[in-house]
Amino acid sequence: RDRLRSRGLGDVYKRQTMYRTKTCGELNINNVEETVELAGWIQKIRDLGAMIFIDLRDQFGITQIVINDEELQKQAKDLTTESCIHISGKVVERSNKNTKIPTGEIEVIANEIEVLGKCKNVLPFEINTDQEVREDLRLEYRFLDLRNEKLHNNILLRSKILKTLRDKMDELGFAEIQTPILANSSPEGARDYLVPSRLNPGEFYALPQAPQQFKQLLMVSGFDKYFQIAPCFRDEDPRADRAPGEFYQLDFEMSFATQEDVFKVIEEVVPYTFKKFTTWKVDEGPFIKIPYREAMEKYGIDKPDLRNPLIIQDVTKCFEDSDFKAFEGKTIKAIIVPNGAEHGRKFFDKMTEYATSDEVGAKGLAWTKYEESGEVTGGIAKFITDDIKEQLVNEFGMSKNSSVFFIADEFKTAQKIAGLVRIELGKRLDLLEKDVYRFCYIVDFPMYELSDEGTIDFNHNPFSMPQGGMEALETKDPLDILAYQYDLVCNGSVSYTHLRAHET
């Protein structure tokens, strides 16, 4: 501290802003002969006897430090990787340049070293390694885990993305407003996290699953356009398509807006943001719109990955007169795979094994091949009559050298299993379109659905506007009512939105 004060570096509590004249990622050949100060963490130490080399790392890069002074070498011999140090020294040109890093043309000859924080000799795991590290160990030593370059860069990328979103929403006239975190519970799709009230024993706050009610209040209060990077808390089991615990979403609301107005905002913000941070191809708006029922029929799921070219077709009518008992009285879904006849029996057995696993739950997976010769072979070929073959070719697009997978079950079950089989086929056959983000809207969701207990419940939430307005609620069968609810889907992942009900 005294040394820093004597050099006129101001209050010691502000020294982090005065600790270095350069970062570890910005020095180059133009800085040769300059005296610089650097601070960071030791990534690697190489003791060659006559001199010691240190790779010094900070958020911005790595600089090689050379220690050839005897006194400094004694000090350096006690240093360990991941120790935090401050050095001053002279920039010189490297004799053996490293083209893999931006600072590879230079090195710094140290004339002073200050240890800011010494690390233990043995780390619980290597920081920058391709080896798998146990998650519980990573979480226990999170401060070390976050030094990992990939993870570190992901967090910085998130920061840049959030700034881009904020700037774009501001450009579009949205005001950023933070809504309360502690609130009353409201009906949502998952369980609430509850916080006991100290002042009111026996009563609880709920952490918001989404800022639904508060943003409605903002619109009623006359705020025209609102947004926030909203924290959301959902107490649900972790699944591949869920974000359990805590996550953040771009949340926005508009006054006096139609569904198309919302789409325009999404199509302004989303492609712009994606293109700024990826080299992949990004769909431009307007995004295609797929009705919910069509999505379920063609893809077996309401968040389809459009990079996968396979579709599901209902071929029940083809087998109406079939004597294949396994199909009798069932809904039959088919997935036609171009060039699928090239695969051997092992592939089909593996797909059957997947379909009948506990994860999927199919009773079986029928299949057959349509060879180049025009012959139907393998699997259930003996049940594919000439009439069925003709229908599959003429009405459903079965082409030569293809294979067909059949799922037979009760309607909803067949639909669900076919959706999972389609996804798995896309993965195993490497059919997904490469380096592209495919967007679509899933629209016309049912307002209500039957619960497992047979009662009518909201499909998404009670805040959405029914198509046909309040009159539809009074005159239509609840299960026939569609809602102004729509999901934005990208490569099989989903973002949910809807048009708010404003009538009572």
Segments the model singles out, each with a brief description of its role:
Residues D2, R7-Q16, T497-T504:
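Conserved small/polar residues in nucleotide/adenosyl-binding loops
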Residues R15-R500:
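Class II aminoacyl-tRNA synthetase catalytic cores and aaRS-like
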